[in-house]
């Protein structure tokens, strides 16, 4: 398990870089008294969490946007306007 301080530093680094160079991974591991493997695996897991977290809001936004556009009258002018542009 990681200490709060280690997680804080790892999160801070992740905020700036989702991928580490080997040199940076060695520096972080040394600074936080972790092995390179621990840092590498933490970043792999964190990237997966990040991808999951960022997929959900996008799909929700898409479904709500498409739902609102097709549900009401505002959808009609939107469907007509693309026909006006090509001609």
From Swiss-Prot:
Residues 77-87 have a biased composition (Polar residues). Disulfide bonds: none annotated. Gene3D superfamilies: Homeodomain-like. Residues 63-73 have a biased composition (Low complexity). Its main location: nucleus. GO terms for cellular component: nucleoplasm. One of its GO terms (molecular function) is RNA polymerase II cis-regulatory region sequence-specific DNA binding. Sequence-specific transcription factor which is part of a developmental regulatory system that provides cells with specific positional identities on the anterior-posterior axis. PANTHER family: HOMEOBOX PROTEIN HOX-A4 (PTHR45771:SF2), HOMEOTIC PROTEIN DEFORMED (PTHR45771). This is Homeobox protein Hox-A4. It comes from Ovis aries. The gene is HOXA4.
